[in-house]
């Protein structure tokens, strides 16, 4: 009886995440490669999505992109957002790109002080 109760409590606390066969297969292929890649750039628009995708999906390396800023000091030719609002847009763009290319996204706390040319 106690075992059944403990098992019931344990199973209610464990989060079961359903994965497709393709996702499981891709995760298994990553076990055959030991290594990681960190792509580092100053601004969100300096990323190389093709390279990140190659390392994440073909080489099966643990791959991440570190953007030193969130792009809040950049220019915006297609909208009115500047400053922090532009940084929010650029941040969401990078997070969406990582969902597609399979990399992880990281940011530093550096502040983008604007266009310098």
Q: What is the predicted function of each stretch?
A:
Residues 2-13:
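Bacterial N-terminal signal peptides
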Residues 19-117:
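Active-site rim/loop-helix segments in enzyme catalytic domains that contact anionic ligands
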Residues 14-18:
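Sec/Tat signal peptide C-region and signal peptidase I cleavage site
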């Amino acid at each position: 009886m106690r075992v059944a109760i403990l098992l019931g409590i344990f199973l209610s606390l464990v989060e079961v995440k359903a994965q497709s066969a393709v996702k499981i297969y891709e995760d298994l292929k990553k076990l055959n490669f030991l290594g990681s890649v960190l792509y580092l750039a100053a601004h969100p628009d300096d990323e190389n999505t093709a390279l990140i995708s190659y390392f994440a999906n073909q080489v099966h390396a643990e791959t991440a992109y570190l953007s030193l800023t969130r792009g809040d000091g950049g220019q915006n030719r297609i909208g009115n957002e500047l400053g922090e609002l532009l940084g929010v847009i650029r941040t969401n763009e990078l997070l969406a790109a990582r969902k597609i290319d399979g990399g992880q996204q990281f940011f530093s706390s550096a502040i983008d002080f604007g266009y310098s040319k």
